[in-house]
């Protein structure tokens, strides 16, 4: 029986699939599907929390990491380290207690240096295990977004157009 109300249990997007599969009575897939290798599902089944059997899914020592275009985060227990790259941030890691400071206004990295370093090490482990690539120097999200949009819109034609522009430009200058 699903419990009504709000839970304070930590959950992440990766937990949705195992939870739905659990409620549907479907086993998690193995390492192969239709003869092809598949990546493992990394999330956890939230049904014990949703059924009122547990108040948390992740133990205090377990970590959940995430990275997108250089912005990165690692959750562990009540804490979170986060880095936001320019222009949204300054590229500096920060530590927050997300239970007592959900607005993330009080950076605890200087007050809790040991926890901060342990979580940075945890993020490096996440990065290595998940083959997260470091961004090249000078990386710009906006430039990459623009480049991807051009490539999607014009495909291989964009390369031909740029080369033609380079060849023909001297005749117009």
Where are these regions (language model features)?
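Long, internal low-complexity/basic segments
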Residues: 16, 21, 81, 86-92, ...
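C-terminal cap/loop subdomain of S1 sulfatases and analogous C-terminal strand-loop tails that border
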Residues: 2-5, 9-98, 149-153
């Amino acid at each position: 029986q699903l419990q009504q109300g709000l839970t304070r249990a930590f959950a992440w997007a990766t937990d949705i699939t195992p939870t739905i599969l659990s409620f549907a009575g479907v086993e998690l897939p193995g390492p192969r599907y239709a003869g092809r290798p598949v990546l493992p599902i990394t999330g956890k089944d939230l049904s014990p929390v949703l059924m009122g059997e547990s108040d948390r899914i992740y133990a205090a020592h377990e970590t959940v990491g995430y990275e997108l275009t250089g912005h990165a985060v690692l959750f562990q227990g009540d804490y979170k380290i986060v880095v936001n790259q320019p222009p949204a941030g300054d590229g500096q890691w920060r530590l927050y207690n997300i239970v007592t400071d959900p607005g993330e206004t009080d950076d605890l990295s200087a007050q809790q240096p040991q926890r901060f370093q342990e979580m940075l090490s945890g993020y490096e482990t996440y990065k290595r295990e998940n083959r997260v690539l470091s961004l090249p120097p000078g990386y710009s999200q906006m430039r990459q977004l623009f480049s991807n949009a051009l490539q999607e819109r014009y495909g291989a034609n964009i390369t031909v157009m740029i080369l033609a522009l380079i060849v023909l430009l001297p005749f117009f200058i």
